[in-house]
Design a protein with these regions (language model features):
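N-terminal subdomain of nucleotide-sugar transferases
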Residues: 1-53, 83, 155-157, 161
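Structural beta-sheet core signal
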Residues: 24-26, 112, 182
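Acceptor-binding helix/loop patch of EC 2.4 sugar-transfer enzymes
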Residues: 56-63, 83, 111-147, 165, ...
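Membrane-proximal helix-turn-helix segments that form the acceptor-binding/catalytic region
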Residues: 70, 74-78, 97, 101-105, ...
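Short N-terminal targeting/anchoring amphipathic segment
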Residues: 76-96, 108-111
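Phosphate- and divalent-cation-binding pockets in alpha/beta enzyme and binding domains
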Residues: 97-98, 165-169
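Carbohydrate-associated surface elements
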Residues: 162, 186
Length: 187
């Protein structure tokens, strides 16, 4: 979602009013960024949110995502070195790659805000054709990572009770109930 149309800003604005501070790293498509930049900058400044927009890359498929992950890792390291991050809130799977690595390497708590079963959604939506061996490998990679995200995160946010129940139905996941909260988009 473009940052201006997502639930992210209202969510963290509420938390800043409770005394928390944020560095928000987002990937923005150039046209949307140019259209909304001044508004989002003003909202962030007014609420003491440090926004770090990065350019979203789409092509070539897969390699562009690897490039975006590298950019995210670099800025996350810079922010941690300068400010000493105390929690990383990862909205979806790509950012969770960074959150999990920071948890493992630096001991920083990691909140996994899953949104949905991303790898399955890519397959169900026809974006990843499992007949293609590369997409089949990427799908398997993220399904394995998904288990690590659930197991190793300090807390998980699911959009639905059905999502939470699905996770808890998997082998060796039935004990995760207390660390999974359901927060629908409409909240």
């Amino acid at each position: 979602d473009p940052l201006g149309q997502s639930q992210v800003l209202p969510y963290i604005i509420g938390l800043t009013k409770a005394g928390y501070s944020f560095h928000l790293v987002s990937f923005e498509k150039p046209d949307r960024y140019n259209e909304n930049r001044l508004t989002i900058e003003a909202i962030c400044k007014e609420n003491s949110i440090e926004w770090h927009p990065l350019k979203y890359t789409k092509r070539p498929p897969l390699l562009s995502t690897v490039w975006d992950v590298l950019k995210m890792r670099r800025i996350s390291n810079q922010l941690h070195n300068k400010h000493g991050l105390s929690l990383i809130h990862c909205r979806s799977y790509i950012s969770a790659l960074i959150g999990l690595s920071f948890k493992r390497q630096k001991g920083i708590p990691f909140l996994f805000d899953m949104r949905g079963f991303w790898a399955d959604e890519r397959v169900d939506g026809g974006i990843w054709q499992l007949k293609n061996p590369i997409f089949k490998w990427v799908y398997g990679y993220f399904k394995k990572k998904e288990v690590h995200f659930f197991r190793e995160s300090d807390h998980v946010v699911s959009l639905t009770k059905a999502g939470k129940n699905e996770i808890m139905s998997w082998d060796e996941m039935d004990d995760l109930g207390p660390k999974i909260s359901v927060i629908p988009c409409c909240v």
